[in-house]
């Protein structure tokens, strides 16, 4: 009996637990042993398919800045075009759907001279956005005045009368004040609530020499400077050379406006130095909180755990995903280059190999 026990427990005849001799199609890569065949795996990755964008579950998702402002671009809303005034809903996530915002349908704007195309995207990055109820400057009595506030048939208001952007006042000198003037400076106070950023829109108008003399009493190029939050910007107006142009069915115009904005932090005053043709700030944007921004097309359909720039709305069925790597927000799977698997079975070895290692008595015992 003693001899038999020694044979059964010898190295040549050991019984290996946790190893099966059944066929296995599963291979996993390990850190220490490389590729290993196992009897079972749990897939940890998925490869998404492209779908519509969706609202992010558990939070509000903002598509257009003003969903109820029909036939308006986001730039129309950001500048306060008369027929594009409305509430911008709060949102924790926003869709950048106008990669290069289109022209505002009002007075012709020289978009490429400033960063004004970025204004809708700047606003989109805030959770809460509202337009002030009061004007930040009294345009009629501003330095260099008295002024009348100009309007244009190219910018009709809700009653189809002449209008202009709500964020700016076109300061046209009164008849007895149409003369050239040296640069003057006006302070732009902070009128938003503490903790908000104030986005102040301003600009200037220029035209051909004849119109410049008629409107302002000076046909020379005019100088303009804005300064806020440590950022100073300089401009010189261009006189003439503009083909007549209409925006969104408006009246053809020989003049152009240049529009810019400045960001004023809580309690900080800004300044604008100007000559003739100034578009003085009026209503300002008050914004707070952060909204995560992702680039994609509209509309938003349904809800999803995750918003992905390439795949749209995703529901998280696995912790990881393969495919195209792009920006994503929400409860999203983690991108990996290759599929990941978690072994939930035992290590596989062919039956012939097990018989050789165990020997005759071990094979019977196994």
Curated annotation (Swiss-Prot):
The keyword Cytoplasm does not apply. The gene is HA. Its main location: virion. Gene3D superfamilies: 3.90.209.20, Hemagglutinin Chain A, Domain 2 (2.10.77.10). Glycans are attached at residues 37, 71, 157, 177, 315, 344. The lineage of its organism: Viruses, Riboviria, Orthornavirae, Negarnaviricota, Polyploviricotina. One of its GO terms (cellular component) is viral envelope. GO terms for biological process: fusion of virus membrane with host endosome membrane; fusion of virus membrane with host plasma membrane; symbiont entry into host cell; virion attachment to host cell. It holds the Pfam family Hemagglutinin. This is Hemagglutinin. Binds to sialic acid-containing receptors on the cell surface, bringing about the attachment of the virus particle to the cell. Plays a major role in the determination of host range restriction and virulence. Class I viral fusion protein. Responsible for penetration of the virus into the cell cytoplasm by mediating the fusion of the membrane of the endocytosed virus particle with the endosomal membrane. Low pH in endosomes induce an irreversible conformational change in HA2, releasing the fusion hydrophobic peptide. Several trimers are required to form a competent fusion pore. Residues 1-12 form the signal peptide. Major glycoprotein, comprises over 80% of the envelope proteins present in virus particle. The extent of infection into host organism is determined by HA. Influenza viruses bud from the apical surface of polarized epithelial cells (e.g. bronchial epithelial cells) into lumen of lungs and are therefore usually pneumotropic. The reason is that HA is cleaved by tryptase clara which is restricted to lungs. However, HAs of H5 and H7 pantropic avian viruses subtypes can be cleaved by furin and subtilisin-type enzymes, allowing the virus to grow in other organs than lungs. In natural infection, inactive HA is matured into HA1 and HA2 outside the cell by one or more trypsin-like, arginine-specific endoprotease secreted by the bronchial epithelial cells. One identified protease that may be involved in this process is secreted in lungs by club cells. Palmitoylated. Homotrimer of disulfide-linked HA1-HA2.
């Amino acid at each position: 009996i003693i001899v038999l026990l020694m044979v059964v427990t010898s190295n040549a005849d050991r019984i290996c637990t946790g190893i099966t001799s059944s066929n296995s199609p599963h291979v996993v890569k390990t850190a220490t042993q490389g590729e290993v065949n196992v009897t079972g795996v749990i897939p940890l990755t998925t490869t998404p398919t492209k779908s519509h964008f969706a609202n992010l579950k558990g939070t509000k998702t903002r598509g257009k800045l003003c969903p109820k402002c029909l036939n308006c671009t986001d730039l129309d809303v950001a500048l306060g075009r008369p027929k594009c005034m409305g509430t911008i809903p709060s949102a924790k996530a926003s869709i950048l759907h106008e990669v290069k915002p289109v022209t505002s349908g009002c007075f012709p704007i020289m978009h490429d001279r400033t960063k004004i195309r970025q204004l809708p995207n700047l606003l989109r990055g805030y959770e809460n956005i509202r337009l002030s109820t009061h004007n930040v400057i009294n345009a009629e009595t501003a330095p260099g005045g008295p002024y009348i506030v100009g309007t244009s048939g190219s910018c009709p208001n809700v009653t189809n009368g002449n209008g202009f952007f709500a964020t700016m006042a076109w300061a046209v000198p009164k008849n007895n004040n149409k003369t050239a003037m040296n640069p003057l400076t006006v302070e732009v106070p902070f009128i938003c609530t503490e903790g908000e950023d104030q986005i102040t829109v301003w600009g200037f108008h220029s035209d051909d020499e004849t119109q410049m003399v008629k409107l302002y009493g000076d046909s020379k190029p005019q100088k303009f400077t804005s300064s806020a939050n440590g950022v100073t910007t300089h401009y010189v107006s261009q006189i003439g050379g503009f083909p007549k142009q209409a925006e969104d069915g408006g009246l053809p115009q020989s003049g152009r406006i240049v529009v810019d904005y400045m960001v004023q932090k809580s309690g900080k005053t800004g300044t604008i130095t100007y000559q003739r043709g100034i578009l003085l700030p009026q209503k300002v944007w008050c914004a707070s909180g952060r909204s995560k921004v992702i680039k994609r097309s509209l509309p938003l359909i349904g809800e999803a755990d995750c918003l992905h720039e390439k795949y749209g709305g995703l529901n998280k069925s696995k912790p990881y995903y393969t495919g195209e790597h792009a920006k994503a927000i929400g409860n999203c799977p983690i991108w990996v280059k290759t599929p990941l698997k978690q072994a939930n079975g035992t290590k596989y070895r062919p039956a012939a190999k097990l018989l050789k290692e165990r020997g005759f008595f071990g094979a019977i015992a196994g």
